[in-house]
């Protein structure tokens, strides 16, 4: 879960500047993880047949066991995931290394074929947890996947990934870690060898699919397993510690009216001194 980016104005820093407080924040599913959930659901369904699941999606959330986290997990279950795992932890006790260690413990227990996760968290933007997890597992990592296609042998995946300079196409077999870009939401981005290649998914602009009313009702009965960092035998010691947080300087809020373009240019040059 992450603090809702749309409510960033509510962010507060503790008096000593050593922490960001969660008071008054609203929580939601990490948007990047929502993209990954959509990819995982497409990989494990026959979209040409209503409600035809051909695999299992297990959600993992790390955070406090409160109503917000429970709601977010239920949201993912309502979209189609089969079950959830909640690893209880305080938000302030996590960094990318701890998250990767927790996920490795879950992977060791669950033995999934793939781990599909957001490339970053919307609040921290570290963009390293997936890579650290893959290193701990000894699995290949494909970051910023924009399309996934199952090979003719049913074992190989052909993946296109976004680069700053273009697109790279790679093939991978066996267990792997994927992080996804928003292009995974395109109508033909995932071909799993079961859903007909001619099938076109609904066009998604921002996030994954919406939950149906039936899915919402079914999600209430789907299992969520609770565990803790200690139960998983994970060292919860952070390797990254922030020394200070500062809010940006407050704006004056003053409004100045200008008569014409010449007046605007004069004020930008002589008063604001930005040109």
Predicted feature descriptions by range:
Residues 1-17:
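Positively charged, low-complexity intrinsically disordered leader regions
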Residues 33-48:
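Histidine-anchored nucleotide/phosphate-binding helix
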Residues 49-58, 83:
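Residues at the starts of beta-strands that form the adenosine-phosphate
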Residues 72, 124-139:
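Short Gly/Thr/Asp-enriched flexible loops that form oxyanion-binding sites at enzyme active sites
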Residues 113, 118, 132-156:
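Short, acidic/small-residue loops that bind anionic groups at enzyme active sites
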């Amino acid at each position: 879960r992450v603090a809702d980016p749309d409510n960033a104005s509510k962010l507060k820093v503790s008096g000593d500047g050593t922490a960001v407080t969660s008071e008054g924040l609203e929580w939601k599913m990490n948007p990047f993880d929502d993209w990954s959930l959509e990819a995982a659901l497409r990989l494990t369904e026959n979209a040409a047949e209503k409600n035809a699941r051909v695999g299992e999606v297990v959600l993992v959330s790390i955070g406090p066991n409160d109503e917000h986290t429970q709601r977010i997990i239920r949201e993912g279950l309502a979209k189609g995931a089969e079950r959830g795992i909640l690893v209880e932890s305080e938000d302030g006790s996590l960094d990318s290394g701890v998250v990767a260690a927790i996920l490795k413990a879950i992977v060791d227990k669950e033995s999934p074929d793939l781990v599909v996760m957001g490339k970053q968290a919307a609040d921290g933007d570290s963009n390293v947890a997936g890579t650290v997890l893959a290193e701990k597992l000894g699995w290949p990592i494909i970051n910023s996947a924009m399309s996934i296609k199952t090979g003719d042998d049913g074992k190989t995946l052909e993946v296109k990934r976004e680069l700053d300079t273009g697109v790279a196409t790679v093939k991978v077999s066996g267990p792997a870690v994927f992080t996804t870009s928003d292009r995974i939401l395109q109508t033909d981005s995932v071909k799993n060898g079961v859903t007909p290649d001619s099938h076109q998914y609904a066009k998604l602009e921002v996030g994954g699919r919406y939950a149906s009313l039936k899915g919402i009702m079914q999600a209430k009965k789907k299992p969520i397993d609770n565990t803790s960092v200690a139960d998983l035998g994970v060292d919860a010691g952070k390797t990254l510690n922030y020394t200070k947080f500062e809010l940006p300087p407050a704006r004056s809020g003053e409004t100045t009216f200008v008569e014409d373009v010449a007046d605007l240019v004069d004020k930008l040059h002589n008063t604001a001194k930005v040109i």
